[in-house]
Amino acid sequence: GTPEFISDEANIAHDAKYTVFDGRKLGKWHYTAVNYIYLCGILSKLEHKSYEKLFRETYIKPLKLKQTEFLWSSMTKLKSAGWVPGYERSSGQFMRVDHDQAVKDAHNELGAGSIVMSNADLAKTIEYILHGKLLTKESRKVLFKGKAPSYYNGGFYNLKKYKVANGAGEGYYTFLRTTKGAKDMIIIQDNHTAHGEFGKIKKKVNRIMSIMLHFN
């Protein structure tokens, strides 16, 4: 994004200017937030609405989500939604992440890291996406079927027995595991993060999900 936030459109134009083609990566899977940023730009252009407006109309309003907000919303709205600041471990102690910097990063991660949401709201949204009327069965079959080695598509790592989604940044961790129809789900979020802990927690959550499904 631009050094100082101007608009979503300016950020997308800035990203496009600095996006280059690397032939060595052609045909190889690699996650990058810029794909979601471009998708947000395409949707906004097609619908003539901002990504925020589209998100509110698609999820927040119809699902009556009370604990979901954009990180750049007013502090009043954030606190009303139950928002808590993120902390990162540095030199042996947890330091609060600067909110202004977190907001700038949220703008730069449009569509990939802009939302703060409670476990309950996240579960409700995931159930709506995987089992509700938002998508047709045919659309879900296409969207949630990734290719090896990661099986990533539609925002999930689509494993054989369950789906995986993770998030990290600005002092937050999110780990989500769900069965295909969102009947069984694990959601763990934390606002205290430390270098090297993400991978360890991710493996433990995967293990818990496997055990849960084994006894289900």
Which functions belong to the PLM regions below?
Residues 1-162, 166-168:
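Short, surface-exposed loop or secondary-structure junction motifs
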Residues 66-67, 181-184:
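Loop/turn elements at helix/coil->beta-strand transitions in domains of secreted/extracellular proteins
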Residues 106, 192-194:
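A short acidic/small-residue loop/turn micro-motif
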Residues 163-164, 183-185:
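Hydrophobic residues embedded in beta-strands of well-ordered beta-sheets
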Residues 168, 189-190:
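Short clusters of small/polar residues that mark proteolytic maturation junctions
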Residues 172-181:
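Short, surface-exposed beta-strand/loop micro-motifs that present aromatic residues
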Residues 177, 185-189:
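Structural recognition of the beta-strand scaffold that forms the well-ordered cores
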Residues 194-216:
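Short, gly/Ser/Thr-rich active-site loops of penicillin-recognizing serine hydrolases
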